[in-house]
Amino acid sequence: MIRIFAGLCAALMLVAQPSMAMAAEDDAVPDYRVPKNAAKGKFVAHGQFKAVPFTAGEVTRFMFDGWAGKPIPVWAFVPSGVDVKEAPIMFMLHGAKRNPARYLLEWVPHAQKYGFVVIAPEFAARDFRGSRRYNLGYVFGRKDDRYYLRDEEKWTFSAIEPLFDHAVRELGSVQTGYTLYGHSAGSQFVHRFLYYKPEARVKRFLAANAGWYTMPDAEQVYPYGFKDPYGLTAAALGEDRIRMAVQKDMIILLGDQDNDANHESLRRTPEALLQGEHRFNRGASFLDAGHAQAKRLGVECGWRGAVVKDVAHSNGGIAKVAAKYVK
């Protein structure tokens, strides 16, 4: 059941789920500990992770080096029994624990049910350490205690588009765009990708349970808003980018039990606390901010919200609902 209601935010949707214990984000295991015969999917390793064709009905892993940044492992699942050329493509961004295998296994039954391809790049901590290099997109570098704007082709954000091109070629796909999904830190990646990659071929953004947000606000200092904090005028995002961003098709998914104000990984800076005391409230604040900016600018807001009942900070719990929104 989906119920539209006002109060929390004008565009927020309530998605009823049966009450059940969902796997918590904290229970995630590192990729290298996932057994080859994992219950929900069969892993196929191709040599030293060379670029290979995707394999229907199996979870595969390969190394992708077709961008200007460091080579990254990529996990993928192609559903069986579907026309792969026509199948929608979804990119899945993992959380701060850098656990794409776990995330992907939680998505396999839904991808098979709805018939879409899932591609999960792995931004390992050894190469993309901390939030600046991963969920903030590695837009800014730091040297000798000074920040600088990095070459765009080396941003973490910049791995996605060439990886999509690679997938289209390997699959023989006719798809011209994709869905971009992320949970937790991956959700932070997704909503900031929307700002920094306006020309990307994303059909729909699915941002789930982010811990904190870059608000569409030119007066708030980055990374909590668009205002330049480093004296790098060329890096500042302004009104035009806000206008573009709030018109994009984005669904903000929030578990109604993701309300632990003392969660060990929840950011508690003064700026983050202004967004709300926990993830659920911060997500609602972000959605409200997008609609407020759209109203101010006189444009139609493309942002919607989905509240997932009886789910806390769980990628698997969110996936049951998010899968229905893949385009």
Give names to the regions the model predicted.
Residues 13-21:
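C-terminal segment of classical bacterial N-terminal signal peptides
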Residues 82-87, 92-129, 215:
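Short substrate-entry loop that stabilizes the transition state in hydrolases
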Residues 91-93, 208, 254, 308:
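Alpha/beta-hydrolase
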